[in-house]
Structure formats: C-alpha cells, structure tokens
C-alpha cells in the first residue's frame, strides 16, 4: 500500500521470502511484495565472477536471485552465459510510487547509484557534498530553510556554498552562492535562506 500511495521503496534479496515463523513461502517470490516490485523469482545461486550490465554496471557478490520482470524496468541484468536472461536490479512504477529491487549483493558503487536514483524518485534533495562534510536541511519556525554543514573531521574543511543568498546564523554574515565556507574541525556552520 505504501508504494501504491506514492512511496518509494528499496528492497533487497531474500525480502518476503519467509513468514514470521521462518516458514518459506512456496509460491513465487518475493511473495507479498511481488506485485509492488513487478518481479518474481523461484531460483537463486551464488555468483562467481558475475558482472552486472544494463543501465547500471557493477558486480554481483555473495548471493543472487534470478529475477523475472513482470512489468518492472530492468536496470541491470547478469552478464553471464547461464544467467544472461535474468534481471538483477529492477525499478517498478506501482500506483503513484516506485519500488526498486536488488536481487543480488552488489558492489558499493552500484548500490550508491540505486540509492541515488531512489532518493531522486522520492523527491529527496541530494546535497552533492560528501564525507567528511555532511549537510542536513530543515525548515525553521519562520518557514526559512536551514542548512547545517557538519565537519566530521579533525581538520578544517572548505566547501563551496552552492545555494541561493543566505545568512550565517552564528556570525550574521551574508553568504552568496559560490562563497567558500570554511568549517573548523569537528564544527558546524548553520546557514539560513
């Protein structure tokens, strides 16, 4: 229902495989999630040197399900002579929402790409900044956007402020797009727009 009502859901392999008593469902997997995900499977294997290919590229690791799309868009399939006819990662529009399914353990870069796509589908703004500077966003009681630039390192960090005109809440100084923000070690800059 969550996806049908407009939610974005990311599901990984073995989800919906068994009930709360660990009894494996005997029908097509992933049982109760099958319609929302737009896929089914009834076979799995353990990959050895299996690459992923399609809109996403990467590597299948540890475990892989042999997915059969039933309306879902295939983002990646298995690049392997035995498994090339099966999907590995899918995206499905269901009702007003979107559901993603990862039928295998992937490499980190592939997983990040799926998560970025899902966040975009959910309307989540990605900051474009990365560790050790993490940005969090909220709205204050006046309806203004507040961004917290958190430095999670023992050395000063400098980032370029890429949003519209704003003010540093602590210093009261005006901040314009393109301004270099220096964030002391283990500190924060709070910017209000």
Task: Describe each model-derived feature in a short phrase.
Residues 1-193:
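A conserved amphipathic helix/loop scaffold
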């Amino acid at each position: 229902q969550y996806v049908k009502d407009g939610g974005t859901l990311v599901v990984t392999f073995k989800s919906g495989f068994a009930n709360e008593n660990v009894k494996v469902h005997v029908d097509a997997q992933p049982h109760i999630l099958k319609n929302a995900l737009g896929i089914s499977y009834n076979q799995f294997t353990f990959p050895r040197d299996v690459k992923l290919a399609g809109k996403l590229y990467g590597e299948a690791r540890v475990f892989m399900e042999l997915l059969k799309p039933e309306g879902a868009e295939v983002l990646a399939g298995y690049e392997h002579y035995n498994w090339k006819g099966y999907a590995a990662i899918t995206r499905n529009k269901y009702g007003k929402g979107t559901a993603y399914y990862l039928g295998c353990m992937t490499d980190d870069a592939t997983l990040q790409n799926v998560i970025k796509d899902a966040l975009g589908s959910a309307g989540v703004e990605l900051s474009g900044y990365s560790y050790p500077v993490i940005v969090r966003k909220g709205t204050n009681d006046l309806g203004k956007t507040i961004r917290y630039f958190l430095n999670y390192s023992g050395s000063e960090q400098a980032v370029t402020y890429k949003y519209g005109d704003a003010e540093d809440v602590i210093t009261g100084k005006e901040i314009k797009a393109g301004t270099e923000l220096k964030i002391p070690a283990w500190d924060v800059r709070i910017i209000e727009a």
